[in-house]
Swiss-Prot record:
It comes from Brachyspira hyodysenteriae (strain ATCC 49526 / WA1). Pfam families: Ribosomal_L11, Ribosomal_L11_N. This is Large ribosomal subunit protein uL11. Part of the ribosomal stalk of the 50S ribosomal subunit. Interacts with L10 and the large rRNA to form the base of the stalk. L10 forms an elongated spine to which L12 dimers bind in a sequential fashion forming a multimeric L10(L12)X complex. One of its GO terms (molecular function) is structural constituent of ribosome. Keywords: Methylation, Ribonucleoprotein, Ribosomal protein, RNA-binding, rRNA-binding. The keyword GTP-binding does not apply.
Length: 140
């Protein structure tokens, strides 16, 4: 019989660098998960992705065990890294902070493809382009 899920915790944690400090510690503490054990497991599994901010989904079961899945770096983080900018625009419809071309969109889409609901690279590029526009980045 399957274990009963009592909660799912969604956090963004740097790969290989998880610590019991906020936001992770309080989020897991509320679900009564052994924080030190999770940190050790997470850092071991994500050591090759050191420093990348990973979207992580932690499923907590009734017997206080857990499983976790990492979904890669957020699209906005990849766009900022690719364009070398600190942050998006505060007024995306009025102020453009950078320009992204089709080649850059495709590179980001290739990297995110495994975590997206897109069926092909063109659909993934459209998703990435939408994120870029929402950040105040002009899409060429």
């Amino acid at each position: 019989m399957a274990k009963k899920v009592v909660g799912i915790v969604k956090v963004r944690i740097p790969g290989g660098e998880a610590t019991p400090a906020p936001p992770l510690g309080p989020a897991l503490g509320q679900k009564q998960i052994q924080i030190a054990a999770f940190v050790k497991d997470f850092n071991a599994k994500t050591s090759k992705m050191k420093g990348q901010l990973l979207n992580t989904y932690i499923t907590v079961y009734e017997d206080k065990t857990y499983t976790f899945v990492t979904k890669g770096t957020s699209t906005s983080t990849l766009i900022k890294k690719k364009l070398g900018i600190e942050k998006g625009s505060g007024e995306p419809n009025k102020t453009k902070v950078a320009t992204i071309n089709q080649k850059q969109l495709e590179e980001i889409a290739q990297e995110k493809m495994a975590y997206m609901s897109a069926n092909d690279i063109e659909a993934a590029k459209k998703i990435v382009a939408g994120t870029a526009r929402a950040m105040g980045i002009k899409v060429e």
